[in-house]
Amino acid sequence: MFYPDPFDVIIIGGGHAGTEAAMAAARMGQQTLLLTHNIDTLGQMSCNPAIGGIGKGHLVKEVDALGGLMAKAIDQAGIQFRILNASKGPAVRATRAQADRVLYRQAVRTALENQPNLMIFQQAVEDLIVENDRVVGAVTQMGLKFRAKAVVLTVGTFLDGKIHIGLDNYSGGRAGDPPSIPLSRRLRELPLRVGRLKTGTPPRIDARTIDFSVLAQQHGDNPMPVFSFMGNASQHPQQVPCYITHTNEKTHDVIRSNLDRSPMYAGVIEGVGPRYCPSIEDKVMRFADRNQHQIFLEPEGLTSNEIYPNGISTSLPFDVQMQIVRSMQGMENAKIVRPGYAIEYDFFDPRDLKPTLESKFIQGLFFAGQINGTTGYEEAAAQGLLAGLNAARLSADKEGWAPARSQAYLGVLVDDLCTLGTKEPYRMFTSRAEYRLMLREDNADLRLTEIGRELGLVDDERWARFNEKLENIERERQRLKSTWVTPSAEAAAEVNAHLTAPLSREASGEDLLRRPEMTYEKLTTLTPFAPALTDEQAAEQVEIQVKYEGYIARQQDEIEKQLRNENTLLPATLDYRQVSGLSNEVIAKLNDHKPASIGQASRISGVTPAAISILLVWLKKQGMLRRSA
């Protein structure tokens, strides 16, 4: 039977991509249906209990700038917040938070259940209704049919999912959940390229069986960072530390002696695993010279005894997992409460998608998340938001939208996927972006919130806060530009006390702030330049904009030059191991593909813009810079 009411947009799957897609479409006023096999697992963290990190935190901030859910949810659920790369420049600083799984799931579900225009329905989807190469609905397990103008697939690892523990395997979407086999078969009937990928997760440990007294603690930052531009630290729950242990030679011996029982090394798994989140058996074999690997013991929540040992993802048999865990300091008597496992699943070649994440072959069908070959909650959320907003626009007969690489990490992500595709689970890094000095966490709202407002994603409260911030930045910059101090002025002595070299000429507040030893906080304690802004986000923006103004302008010039390097020739006989500064991944891919030009090299999956810059510098130094006519 058909459900009596039609919808504008149907979302299939309630993970990180699906929840953002559903929220985006509903925020834009479209009647949206979220279909999930289990309402209780909406927003479930299937693997690590954390949000953010290098590159990933940037995506979370961008999702938030467009009115998304993830940043708000983690602000309510984060039990340890840190800024990574805090001592480095603002382009690569990244926020990361440990999460209480239960609180995170509750925050997501509460937001979904209180979102106007959104209906949630619990039933697994087994089929799509496709008419004349256009999707017009979905069919659930019990044969109930829903009609819609657009459908978004956000099915994670569920498509023909197979779980491996040692040489044993069984069908599953993730531990404790069934796979989606009928839907997988149906999608394989469509004109889409399909492959298999693999990911894994570590065993979970009972905290009561760990001796934390012998382990180093890792605390969060104080003051506590905040993820959402609308958030504040008072929303955070109780904060707790993580702990650090290490693998050792005993651990590595256990792994080496049991590789014949690993499904990866025995050839049982055909899917390709994530390069940047390898299993512990992969790490031991790939880095044979390392006698230890750092393992972070991360709490899964304030009311749970489960510990997530970040760094020992494995699909080895359970008895071997026990030996691995108990070989490490502090874990000699540890008990496993959930075994680690690998899961392989279907993904669809993202080169078959438009930049809007709509299929090139089936009109109205959108793909987001791990089905596109990515790995990570943040990558999934960003794609979900983009697919959801474009499904909403399509259902309203409007043109699709996708950010450019120069606008957002989301633009980089989508361009990489749709242009280059991927043969391994793709994760975001800052090194993937050419424009990273302009694509910072701190300015995600300045880049995207106005666009989000035009698209219908940003509500009145966020829009008012954003405009107030803009006004504060502009007013403060004008104040600092127009406030001066001279070497002979009474205030000069106070200013000179904070400078490495005393004033030799008249200087404005902005001139002083450009000095490396001067910070905005320090400057605004000085009599001529007080008081400081009470808006901390605006104050941070003023400092970064002033200090990095010249660098940003220079980067824009570099971008224009980069375009001219498209036709720079690469010698056919070049062994890229000669080029210092390239990563092992880039060297392997360049030696394998042997691109004829910089342009070709730049389009090889995994060859980053930073690697292209290194190549250009090397060619120039060698006197080998040649361009085709």
Swiss-Prot record:
Binding positions (FAD): 13-18, 125, 180, 370
GO molecular function, a single term: flavin adenine dinucleotide binding
Biological process, per Gene Ontology: regulation of cytoplasmic translational fidelity; response to UV; tRNA methylation; tRNA wobble base 5-methoxycarbonylmethyl-2-thiouridinylation; tRNA wobble uridine modification
Organism classification: Bacteria, Pseudomonadati, Pseudomonadota, Gammaproteobacteria, Enterobacterales
Entries under SUPFAM superfamilies matching the protein: FAD/NAD(P)-binding domain
Transmembrane segments: none
Function: NAD-binding protein involved in the addition of a carboxymethylaminomethyl (cmnm) group at the wobble position (U34) of certain tRNAs, forming tRNA-cmnm(5)s(2)U34.
Name the UniProt record assigns to this protein: tRNA uridine 5-carboxymethylaminomethyl modification enzyme MnmG
Keyword set, alphabetical order: Cytoplasm, FAD, Flavoprotein, NAD, tRNA processing
Cofactor names: FAD
Compartments, as annotated in UniProt: Cytoplasm
GO CC annotation: cytosol; cytosolic tRNA wobble base thiouridylase complex
Main subcellular location: cytoplasm
Effect of residue 13 to A: Decrease in FAD binding and partial loss of activity. Loss of activity
Entry similarity comment: Belongs to the MnmG family.
Disulphide-bonded residues: none
